[in-house]
Amino acid sequence: MGDYIISCCSTADLTEEHFRSRDIHYICFHYELDGKQYPDDLGKSMPFPEFYAAMANGAMTKTSQINAEEFEAYFEPFLKDGKDILHVCLSSGITGVINSAMIAKTNLEEKYPQRKICIVDSLAASSGYGLLMDKIADQRDAGLSLGELEQWILAHRLEVNHWFFSTDLTFYIRGGRISKTAGFVGGLLNICPLLNVTDEGKLIPRSKIRTKRKVIAAIVERMKENAANGADYADKCYISQSACLEDAKAVAALVEEYFPHLKGKVEINDIGTTIGSHTGPGTVALFFWGKRRER
């Protein structure tokens, strides 16, 4: 168990304490806010409330993925220390960062032929990615070898269900996920899009629901339909939110009411600055283990 480390990108949207307590290493994405670059470092360089307030006030954001040289600099100290590496990337349906990681792997395995680097596509995002990493840590702690854990991820990653809704369509329109016309009409009618992540790791709209109250009920209904063992679901549930904590708490309360056997309380995290640059404020995301994702 101690001959390899597990690693991911900061876009798993867990807290520093959570990463540390589970012995999960991470590397930071980058983003720009009004032309100034910052690391996506779990809100340390810029607190999340400040980031989302800036977006709400019209600040322009832009994200950039980790390049191969950064991955090499990040991976190499582990290799020098005699460790193999399992790095799980943010979904290839959202970013091409896995390509940078693969280039770094090729270069470093030439330099350290006795070491092994496994790069795996999570096909997940935000705290859904974090939920997967948490289970990966469980499997590592249970004694799985590096190769066994890689195969476990490939077999189970699509069981992580992601459901999102937003009460602010501004940034979905800007990102092209919703047309300007649909966004204008949606704003007038208080329509909240409900989205999920597909088998390809892409975020797509599934339905349009009028009013926040109804979309909160609808997202929990999706968990009722898809959670492993239905109302007897006994695993963890994570929620991510972008400057709408009360909405996230409302979802968590319904989840805890319907699923009395949850493994602990629902964990609410902030949507980080990379994912948040595309969603903007007003997004709540619900993550749980369940059936294969809706196609």
Name each model-derived stretch:
Residues 58-66, 89-96, 123-124:
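Short coil/turn segments at secondary-structure boundaries
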Residues 5-70:
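N-terminal glycine-rich anion-binding loop in soluble enzyme alpha/beta folds
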Residues 2-3, 11-19, 24-30, 86, ...:
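Mixed-charge interfacial surface used for oligomerization/domain docking
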Residues 42-45, 95, 126-127:
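Alpha-helix N-cap/helix-start motif at coil-to-helix transitions, marked by capping-box chemistry
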Residues 70-101:
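N-terminal glycine-rich phosphate/adenylate-binding segment common to multiple enzyme folds
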